[in-house]
Amino acid sequence: YRELYTPKVPNRIEGYYFGPILGLVLSKDGAVREGMSKNDYSSDPGFLLGVQVGKDFGDVRAEVEYAYISFDASISNRGSLSASIHNFFTRLILEKELGDRFDLRAGIGMGVGIVGLEDSADYNGAGFAYDFILGAGYRLAENLSLQLDYRYYLTAANDGYDHMKGHIWLLSAGLDL
């Protein structure tokens, strides 16, 4: 009788997972350069869409991720700027269980950021990028979890633009395979 009415706590499954990522991007202001002149821009909020695949080892997760970041910006003397960044990352995340369903997470990711900035001219480049992550996860079911994370993101500078950096708030789902 007791088993029938006791709520079931989902088991944590170690192994492979994948899932979508959706985020709010708060990019820091930066600058684009043409020769010796530097044009500062003010960033508007943007979005992040992506997918992640990884392996859960218990207290450690290793994952690969593709993410697309987009935001608009204003250049004071020239109008608007559109930014799009394609990221290919690997990430290592440490997790600490808090009870049966909650996890605290911290990690670091690194990879390649392919940056495209467009106004009347195009500023393109690819380079090293990295991020730091802090967040929490909640297990909804045996094979489904949700994570809410904060990331600080940074790419390398290029001849045509400054570092792309900013704050990202993410919501991701993990479907255990």
Identify what each model region corresponds to.
Residues 16, 47-49, 86-88, 104, ...:
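Hydrophobic core residues within well-ordered beta-strands of beta-rich domains
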Residues 1-57, 110-112, 117, 168-177:
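Short glycine/proline- and aromatic-enriched beta-strand/turn motifs that initiate or cap beta-hairpins
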